UniProtKB/Swiss-Prot annotation:
SUPFAM superfamilies recorded: UROD/MetE-like
A Pfam family per the record: URO-D
Key word Lipid metabolism present: no
Gene Ontology terms for molecular function: uroporphyrinogen decarboxylase activity
Principal subcellular localization: cytoplasm
Site annotation Transition state stabilizer: residues: 77
Protein name: Uroporphyrinogen decarboxylase
Subunit structure: Homodimer.
Gene Ontology BP annotations: protoporphyrinogen IX biosynthetic process from glutamate
Length: 358
């Protein structure tokens, strides 16, 4: 086991003292970086970029060369599981992910093949192993998966959606079919994340990107219950170290209490939930991660610094000095000037000394 030179991200997830606030950015490896665009051009297309071990490793490491980040996150796609289940993932320019097949009936669910993460997504595991080795203990590596609900929306809709018409039609007219699909996906996600942990991931995040599109009762029934099942099925310790689990539901700030009850170590927040309110609600029971509006990075240096300091003031307003990781409230956008995230990251580290005494 390689000793970590910087473990403050993991310590913060476990609500242990840190010398400065750890920070990373969702989608930190992405199109806003010119070196990423160059590597993607070499790969030929996005899926080839994901499926080539050397390219996936390279783009994972790129933001760490620019910014003083406290964690790396595996570069992959959220839809690897549906692709491995034979739905035929492809991308059209300007239109996002699409599937050649959709899941609309009970028979469609029954026809899904068996799934084994280590064999069906071996390219992901190879990437995790390679990245872990390349990091050399510099910072921890985060593995991830989409939540069952989020994966199901893409599988039922056949791609991205603004209103989730087919998925919600299934939810209200054939709930048993949707539950059957979600159960299959929960089992697959458990296998997938455990395989990533075996390959070297030191923390994992479940991205429930579309959970916020659900009504209160439906969120519990069709999203949260399956994330709870996943958390219960995950390997929580490896090589004598706890493997923290982060849940992130975009638009889910109103569901903090039931999210805490899943057994996750941390909850990610988007920018619509005040951090000071969330900290008071969770009362030290879990760590919190977030939640700068990614659009803040369009602003001037002074504007970014002001927003970051306000976020940190909120995070530490209640006197707690543990259990907080700075991040964006959603993924960084492709239009951000690559010089701007450095202001965000450096301000987090420098200003948090005011509260952490480092």
């Amino acid at each position: 086991m390689t000793a970590l030179k910087n473990d403050r991200f993991l310590r913060a997830l476990l609500r242990e003292p840190v010398d400065t606030t750890p920070v990373w950015m969702m989608r930190q490896a992405g199109r806003y970086l010119p070196e990423y665009r160059e590597t993607r051009a070499q790969a030929g297309d996005f899926l080839s970029l994901c499926k080539n071990t050397e390219f996936a490793c390279e783009v994972t490491l790129q933001p760490l060369r620019r910014y003083d980040l406290d964690a790396a996150i595996l570069f992959s796609d959220i839809l690897t599981i549906p692709d491995a289940l034979g739905l035929g993932l492809y991308f059209e320019t300007g239109e996002g992910p699409k599937f050649k097949k959709t899941i609309r009936t009970e028979q469609d669910v029954l026809n899904l093949p068996n799934f084994n993460a280590k064999s069906d997504l071996d390219y992901v595991m190879n990437a995790v192993t390679t990245i872990h080795s390349a990091l050399g203990g510099q910072v921890p590596l985060i593995g991830f998966s989409g939540s069952p609900w989020t994966l199901a929306t893409y599988m039922v809709e056949g791609g991205s959606s603004k209103d989730f018409r087919y998925t919600k039609h299934m939810m209200y007219s054939q709930p048993e079919v949707l539950h059957a699909l979600l159960d299959r996906l929960a089992v697959a996600v458990i296998d997938y994340l455990n395989a990533q942990i075996d390959a070297g991931a030191q923390a994992v995040q479940i991205f429930d990107s579309w959970g916020g599109a659900l009504a209160h009762r439906e969120y519990t029934e069709f999203s949260l219950n399956y994330m709870r099942k996943i958390v219960a099925g995950l390997q929580r310790e490896k090589d004598g170290r706890r493997i923290p689990v982060i849940l992130f539901t975009k638009g889910g700030g109103q569901w903090l209490e039931p999210m805490i009850a899943t057994g996750a170590d941390a909850i990610g927040l988007d920018w619509t939930t005040p951090l000071n309110v969330a900290r008071k609600t969770v009362a030290g029971r879990v760590a919190l991660q977030g939640n700068l509006d990614p659009a803040v990075l369009y602003g001037s240096a002074a504007s970014i610094e002001k927003s970051v300091k306000a976020m940190l003031d909120d995070a530490y307003a209640n006197g707690e000095t543990t259990g907080y990781i700075a991040n964006l409230g959603h993924g960084i956008t492709q239009w951000v000037d690559p010089s701007q995230p450095k202001i965000f990251v450096d301000t987090v580290h420098e200003y948090s000394a005011k509260y952490l005494g480092s």
